[in-house]
């Protein structure tokens, strides 16, 4: 690496005003390289949805991907829960899961309300991010194990992987930024994002997954998000002709990144306590890719759409995340969400990318007439 990894992390944290950032990578059997800014390398952060690959590994160790759930209709199978293709919405109608308490029955109480979740489409039709699927998968895995979800994950995944610093305890520092939240993480949400961990432990988790029996099934493509593909608990993309798998996380002022390059036996982990931390980590990821694959990620090229093509997407879209107002503007679309306004340019016939500003690189698309997908979640047009 021409520039030291520590220097890359320092520059990324400064550019995005991130209070604390820890990152590291390992390649093959070599010693891991770690860096930290504003914290120690071994500081535990909330990893949020980086929990999902570990939940998926647990579920696949206990459940058949083709079996029904017993909670949603029988056309919804375990594989749909783990691939965000269940057709169900992301959250319960009443989103505050703290109401289920902190007892061992919290996840079961949550699962009992899952029949009330809005069904958007039939399973397998369109990929739409759904935490609800992971709560149900975690509940089913716990039932099959005859234990709480936390105990099942610890005994079957965390302990065998040697993740001594990974747990459901609160992180070692607070989240910051517009998305920061006070109070504890709801126990019922834990299968979708409840773990706290360190960079070193996530590198060990990556090595464990690469060698695991479940990893091959986790890489079978089941859905297509706005960019790349999704297997069971892992996003996938190709970079320089090489497959890259992983997951990001975002919750309560923490953002995280976890990447696996199987052909190079390489693992990357990045943790921040900032609501814009993912943008800083993107720069650090590029340094990792340059080192391992010889090139960073490339932003897709923009394409030209006619005014008539752009007009087909204009309107107000709604989901339980809010209103998404879309207007035609210049060569692209103007997206308004709450007090935020972003110009996005087309990178495909139905896909748009924000080229600059605090949300640079974010994408949204329109997978079907009358449906938009914002932040990975489907929204219906009025």
Outline where the language-model segments fall:
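Short, well-ordered beta-strand elements
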Residues: 257-275, 373-377
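Active-site SXXK
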Residues: 6-9, 23, 46-65, 137-142, ...
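Alpha-helical scaffolds flanking conserved acidic
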Residues: 44, 66-67, 75-79
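Short, surface-exposed loop or secondary-structure junction motifs
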Residues: 16-19, 30-32, 72-256, 260-262
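A generic structural motif
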Residues: 37-38, 274, 320
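Residue-level signal for short segments within beta-strands and strand-turn junctions
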Residues: 25-27, 238, 337
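Short, conserved catalytic-motif segment at the N-terminal edge
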Residues: 2-48, 65, 115
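Peripheral terminal and inter-domain segments
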Residues: 282-382
């Amino acid at each position: 690496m021409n520039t030291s990894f520590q220097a890359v992390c320092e520059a990324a944290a400064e550019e995005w005003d991130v209070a604390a950032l820890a990152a590291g990578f390992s390649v093959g059997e070599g010693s891991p390289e770690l860096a930290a800014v504003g914290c120690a390398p071994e500081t535990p952060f909330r990893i949020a949805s980086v929990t999902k690959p570990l939940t998926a590994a647990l579920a696949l160790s206990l459940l058949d991907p083709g079996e029904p759930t017993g909670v949603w209709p029988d056309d919804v199978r375990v594989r749909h829960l783990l691939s965000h293709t269940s057709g169900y919405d992301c959250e319960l109608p009443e989103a505050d899961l703290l109401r289920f308490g902190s007892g061992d029955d919290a996840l079961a109480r949550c699962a009992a309300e899952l029949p009330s979740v809005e069904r958007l489409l039939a399973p397998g039709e369109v990929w739409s991010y759904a935490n609800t699927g992971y709560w149900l998968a975690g509940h089913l895995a716990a039932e099959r194990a005859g234990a709480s979800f936390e105990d099942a994950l610890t005994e079957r995944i965390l302990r065998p992987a040697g993740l001594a610093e990974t747990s459901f305890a609160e992180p070692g520092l607070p989240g910051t930024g517009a998305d920061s939240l006070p109070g504890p993480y709801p126990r019922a949400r834990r299968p979708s994002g409840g773990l706290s961990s360190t960079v070193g432990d996530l590198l060990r988790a990556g090595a464990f997954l690469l060698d695991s029996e479940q990893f091959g099934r986790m890489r079978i493509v089941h859905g297509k998000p706005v960019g790349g593909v999704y297997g069971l608990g892992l996003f996938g993309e190709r970079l320089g002709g090489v497959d890259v798998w992983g997951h990001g996380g975002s919750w309560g002022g923490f953002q995280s990144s976890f990447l696996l390059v199987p052909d190079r036996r390489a693992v990357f982990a990045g943790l921040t306590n900032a609501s814009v931390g993912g943008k800083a980590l993107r720069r650090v990821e590029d340094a990792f890719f340059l080192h391992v694959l010889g090139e960073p990620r490339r932003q897709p090229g923009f394409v030209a759409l006619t005014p008539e093509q752009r007009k087909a997407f204009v309107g107000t879209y709604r989901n339980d995340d809010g209103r998404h107002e879309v207007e035609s503007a210049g060569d692209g679309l103007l997206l308004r969400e709450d007090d935020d306004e972003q110009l996005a340019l087309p990178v495909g016939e139905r896909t748009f990318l924000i080229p600059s500003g605090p949300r640079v690189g974010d994408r949204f698309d329109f997978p079907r007439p009358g449906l938009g997908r914002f932040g990975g979640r489907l929204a219906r047009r009025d």
